[in-house]
């Protein structure tokens, strides 16, 4: 659950990978999820929003990817050694279930009575799926192009032109200007402090692959 001083967001990571030892015994893979869901209040259980459920399914998709591996060499088993085109495929695929009426009806209900989610509420939720979807796609394209250009055009002698590059990308794909004082790249941890350098495009590409899976 979310708590003070805890890093925000949600992610999956591997504890150990699948490994077949010389004597034949198998070290089974272990994965863990870190999330920031709403805590229980008083004597009531934690009640997840649809967005939190989608986040859980996304990260659990990464976990399943790691734990169901059939490769017994630790360096390339599970989430390791996966091409960038596919690294987000399992997680995005599981997200799709959060938008299936049958799946939502199965996993949801009133926490006290067990009554299913009212059909009218379910219909409204599903109808909102693609609300402002174009803006979301443009945002992901902006992040992906910015990431690509930073790593492809970088010249050690000249240094990185971070804000200039972002401004040029935004002129191509953004429909809303950013304030001049904005410093979004400073918090773009995926490509600066995470493992997605030159690979952020995989999120949007995984949506295409998962839709066809």
Regions found by a protein language model. Name each.
Residues 1-213:
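Cation-handling catalytic/transport regions enriched in His/Asp/Glu
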